[in-house]
Amino acid sequence: MRILYHHRTASKDGQAVHIEEMIDALRCEGHVVQVVAPGALRTTDSAPVQKSHGQMGEDMGWVHRLKAHLPKAVYELMECAYSYVAYRKLVTTARAFKPDVIYERYNLFLLSGLMAKKRLGIPLLLEVNAPLVQERLHHSGGLTLRRLATWSEGVVWRGADRVLPVTHVMADFVRGRGVPE
């Protein structure tokens, strides 16, 4: 299967380890995986094609400084606006790569996978690791645009062809938001 794997993670942390392991596991199962993410575009054998700021593992301190100096609402709108940047990358890559499926690691305010699915008619598999609206409300300094965040989370979860929660607890939460199994 040809899989277009999309994520918005730039930092080299636990998320990055999970992402790299998922991509490696998919490839070990014989799938051809093309990654679309902040920073480097990657070939199907995982070698970077080009490096740019934002590649997983690079210093992302500028993002934290930006977040600290902007009003929360502005930063959250920027997160949402990034969906357009990611959407353009996804559509361009998908047209060249011709994937069977888009596999996206869910992130708050990230609408690009759903937008690409609707534009190109490619099924969207959505990996959900956490209820990010709740997480951001209670941790990470809070959430200003709660209604927008709740809407975007719901529309992406319900718009995916399959939602892949990583735990039974997360699956119960996703079902509670009206996402069919």
Give residue spans per PLM region.
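Membrane-proximal helix-turn-helix segments that form the acceptor-binding/catalytic region
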Residues: 84, 88-92, 115-118, 132-133, ...
